[in-house]
Amino acid sequence: MGPSHSQLVGSQFGPRSAAYVASAVHAQGADLDHLVELVSGHATARVLDLGCGGGHVSFHVAPHVGHVTAYDLSHEMLAAVERVSAERGLANVSTQQGRVESLPFPEGAFDLVLSRYSAHHWHGFQSALIEVKRVLKPQGKAILMDVVSPGPALLDTYLQAVEMLRDPSHVRNYTLDEWRSALCEAGLAPGAHEVYRLRLEFNSWIARMNTARLHAQAIRSLQASMSEDVLRHFEIDADGSFTIDTMLLEATA
């Protein structure tokens, strides 16, 4: 019998906590800059960073809000967030461990729920969004950032394949339309969005997750077999580096 999805996520990310804290891809980006703009002016807000990983959302918004709860399945990730928060003097960041599908917070506990590069690991995507709605105050805002599927079936199949080969805890990168539909179903009103193109250097992308050599070779073999449509959209280079689509989507409770 294999591990549960939660156990798989924990085993994938726990040992990689230092790599994700240090990751330039996760530590910076136009989406983080825009996020800071959106939360500025909410000096007393209580914020939930859902699936916080290495804590970069928490670190960016903490100086601009009242309190941030960094929430993640991985104890090791949370320990890293606590350490870096202390190093940076971010006294208004606390941590909490748990699953996104069952948040240990009362209704209306937060003014803002933020999440970045986490939702594609959620086993219960819709359940998690329902929980986001529950813990937000009336008219509270969710700001959700993730890799998105470009939509067309061929491009989608390629993206999901390389993601799962790299990281077996991957579930799905959703399209923007799928996100909007799921938010509506959860009782959240989708709002403004931004889209971005994110360049990934192949060797560091693989190293960050400590991907098995056989799986890394399979990704390179798949890339070499792809049609021009895939090569062009993902801008796949000879060394395997490529570009993906990401988004920032706002929603209101």
Predicted region positions:
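Class I SAM-dependent methyltransferase SAM/SAH-binding core
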Residues: 48-50, 54-102
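Conserved Class I S-adenosyl-L-methionine
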Residues: 54, 191-253
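A short SAM/SAH-binding and catalytic strip from SAM-dependent methyltransferases
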Residues: 112-124
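Conserved class I S-adenosyl-L-methionine
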Residues: 1-42, 56-60, 77-80, 143-165, 204-207
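A short acidic, Gly/Pro-enriched loop at the edge of an enzyme's catalytic core
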Residues: 101-112
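A short glycine-rich, Lys/Arg-flanked "PGG" loop and its adjoining helix->strand segment in the class I
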Residues: 126-138
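Short alpha-helix
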Residues: 172-186
